[in-house]
């Protein structure tokens, strides 16, 4: 070790001779070592020391993690007293109002560099051969203040004199051995747990542990400093333990949760361990300081946690790792149970830099890497149905193109206490895009929110990722009328945007579009084949589906065009919030596309049947735990299981009755007349896949309405390769039979039923050569693209029929 320390001495700058500030101590990953001036735990920090007998002003200095003085972060106009200290919080904030919050983070996964500049020269830096950190919450610094000898500090001392005891990175202790792994057990059982030292533990090593969620400290050790600890666990207990030894570094603790759940485990269980003061302390606690929407900006703090996820009783956790949490939401911060976000990062644990688990295999199969996720309390729906947002998003996103937040129910324990049931949700920010778009990180992302300032509804835009230039240019573009669909397509994915609008308007979500909307796009740095235009991430639709007694007759389309008629419901329908949509709908092609989507969705899945199917899935998953959750929070209307069933049934009835009203709202707004009943394949229920006006139906039966004189274009294929659609039979207001797998007609002024006619055979016309194939009509491939040069053996569409060149 002495040889290493001598080498470090020769590699570092001779700062003492220059009589300037020096880098004295750093921490590459600050979990809970020190809190900053805004009551956060900064990601990392650098301590500067003034070794002189006179005060030094920081304004003459810059600091960076790169040897580039011009781009280095300028320190503020502050004085460091003689032989004094100052902490620079390296959290990538770099804002003037944050004073000592630099615009970079220290590297934790590999060698770390820090440069201190004055007069355009490097006056101090870290030793050149520094390796990656041995563990979080371990500091690296000079043995004593300003000394030339560097090493890992046995005790971190941010803002104070260095401890005088250092060692090499390899002098780090191993984790204690748990004789039993954490698990979920029945209430009437017990666990005999032994904690012991690892095989390579040095002489003098001992075990410290806690059962209250805190990170254990040497002061938690029993007087005899035990080498083994035996615990008989008979109630839900969280154990955090680590090894300590004089002259050695201790990593963060290992944690195991022993959950004695009083019911059959039907949904995943999360166990979170953290210091109780991080939640309930009046000055720094997340729960104690997040009880209103105003706290979102004041107390949006993060706190360190260990988090485990269990998916089956008697089995080990799916993951068990360090992370951070914060409170999520606006008005919902006032709920008795808070929504919480959980973050993974390599600086907590290089081996677990993500939550690597397939949370939603039934909804988003194959998505396994998450930077963060939330446990949501239902938002505005907390004291009512609890699942409105999940029901709405899942119903629609299961059938159409949407960027959305998948959902499952879960139980939460914190420090061994049952907190109730929340919903596991994907995020509605850049982390959603990272998970769903193969790790895409080069984004522009803007969140639109509503604020009431001086009793005036405000439309706020927060640029969370990337730049603002493209978005501002987009606003300039759409603020002017007269653009075509093709022009809008250059700026925004019109198809996806209209899906989002149709969903929110059908379900009566009035907390949108002037709130709860996120625009994103791959920016110019992104390496992707995607168009670099905006899409929307769906979030927080819980104001829909009859929340607060809003009837299914409520006219969201009229609210869009006449917000002054709805003074109690128009906060999200200000002019800045609705200009984009209203100007888009002035284009005939976009308007027709929107009307088609609404009408076709309602006859397919956006109705009582489709919504009810989602409700049944969620109810079946959550019901047993929902009853216990209800008992914990004791809301007045929750008297029995039947009361809960009634709430779910009320939501089904709302959705069942909504289409009739929404069809009429559409007809009234755009003078389309009275909608007429239209069914497709309802009587025969043939096993076919049907496309209606370029919208592929999810169900093989369409049961909805349509408007007089609007074009109906249908195509269909059978799932049986030995059969094909050979024609269509129309009955009702008109009675006619049409040949071919494709049908185009106008909706008559009356009700009609359309049934596909199924014939034997593939339905593919065989043509002898390519010249004959081209002779009698334009060719298209199966995706609808024109084909000029057909290839032998491939199937094409000609005059609505499948053909193949032999």
Describe the predicted segments one by one:
Residues 18-192, 196, 202-205, 242, ...:
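Intrinsically disordered, low-complexity linkers and terminal tails enriched in Ser/Thr/Pro/Gly
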Residues 272, 295-453:
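Conserved ATP-binding subdomain of kinase catalytic cores across diverse folds
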Residues 1-20:
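Bacterial Sec-dependent N-terminal signal peptides
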Residues 158-170, 268-269, 277-300, 305-306, ...:
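Middle-to-C-terminal accessory/interaction subdomains
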Residues 22, 79, 88, 135-313, ...:
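Short, compositionally stereotyped local motifs that mark structural "simplifiers"
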